[in-house]
Structure formats: C-alpha cells, structure tokens
C-alpha cells in the first residue's frame, strides 16, 4: 500500500505570525521572545509580518490569542510565558488553565498555536530553557501554518473532484 507523505516545511516566507508574550517573569519572557523572533527571521518570516502583543500574565494569553484569531490576519500564533512553581496551588492552576485555554482557542479557530509557556520549578530552569523553547516555538508555528495550509488545500481539491464528477 502506498502512503502519501507531507514533509516538514519550515519556509516562513509570506506567513503572518502573531505572538502573545506575558509580562510576568519578564526577564525570562524577554529571552523567549528574542529567541522566537530571531528564529522566525531565519525561517523567512519578515519583521513586518510579525505582531507582538503583551499581556499581564499566562492566564491572559488565551484571550489575546482568541482576539488575534478572530481578526483572521494570522497564519499561526505563539504563546510565550513562564510559570515558576511557588509554595501554593497557584502554579498548577495557572499552568493547567493557560494550557487548556491555548489548546481550546487553536482548535476553535483552526489556527496553529505554539505553546511556549514554560512551567518550571526555579528561575534558573526557566532561563536555561528560554533559547531552545523560543526557537522551537517559531519552528512549530511555521511548520504547522504550512501543514494546515496544505491540508486545507486538499479539501479544495476534493471540492473540485466532486464538481468534475457532475
């Protein structure tokens, strides 16, 4: 049996990417943003095709992502933040709710969202992960934007095939 295969496509040329960055734990979030934007540029996403907005913290990220999705202006989005464990249940609440909100927005609007919210035990762990996570999010956003576009084009081909049968 033959199987089709769609290879990873990391060509960011012409893609419009939105980034929502939390300001809480600002030094970590600034490093995440710097790494993400630098990687987007390496992948061919033009600076003017990237919009960065900031929100107070991780719990506010899903709403900003939702508003960006509603605009219809973005091929993919990136969520950047850092949640550092404390001595209360708040860590679990923020981690779980922000992650669930991000997933829901992406599925509701069929827009790829790379989740770059670090959930760590210490500030040191957060700083150690910023470069790699920022780059990974840029790559995931570009790859998924291209994959979604390719899969959407299959639906268009099916519609054309049905028209040909008539």
Swiss-Prot record:
Annotated Gene Ontology cellular component terms: cytosol; riboflavin synthase complex
PANTHER family in UniProt: 6,7-DIMETHYL-8-RIBITYLLUMAZINE SYNTHASE (PTHR21058:SF0), 6,7-DIMETHYL-8-RIBITYLLUMAZINE SYNTHASE DMRL SYNTHASE LUMAZINE SYNTHASE (PTHR21058)
Pfam family, one: DMRL_synthase
Positions annotated to bind 5-amino-6-(D-ribitylamino)uracil: 24, 58-60, 82-84, 115
Organism of origin: Cupriavidus necator (strain ATCC 17699 / DSM 428 / KCTC 22496 / NCIMB 10442 / H16 / Stanier 337) (Ralstonia eutropha)
Coiled-coil blocks: none
Catalysed reactions, as listed in the record: (2S)-2-hydroxy-3-oxobutyl phosphate + 5-amino-6-(D-ribitylamino)uracil = 6,7-dimethyl-8-(1-D-ribityl)lumazine + phosphate + 2 H2O + H(+)
Function: Catalyzes the formation of 6,7-dimethyl-8-ribityllumazine by condensation of 5-amino-6-(D-ribitylamino)uracil with 3,4-dihydroxy-2-butanone 4-phosphate. This is the penultimate step in the biosynthesis of riboflavin.
EC number(s) reported in the record: 2.5.1.78
Binding site for (2S)-2-hydroxy-3-oxobutyl phosphate: 87-88, 129
NCBIfam families: lumazine-synth
Keyword tags: Riboflavin biosynthesis, Transferase
Descriptive protein name: 6,7-dimethyl-8-ribityllumazine synthase
Active site: 90
Family designation: Belongs to the DMRL synthase family.
MF annotations from Gene Ontology: 6,7-dimethyl-8-ribityllumazine synthase activity
CDD domains: Lumazine_synthase-I (cd09209)
Transmembrane regions listed in the UniProt entry: none
Superkingdom in the source lineage: Bacteria
Enzyme class: transferase
Keyword Iron attached: no
Lineage of source species: Bacteria, Pseudomonadati, Pseudomonadota, Betaproteobacteria, Burkholderiales
GO biological process, one term: riboflavin biosynthetic process
Pathway: Cofactor biosynthesis; riboflavin biosynthesis; riboflavin from 2-hydroxy-3-oxobutyl phosphate and 5-amino-6-(D-ribitylamino)uracil: step 1/2
Transferase keyword on record: yes
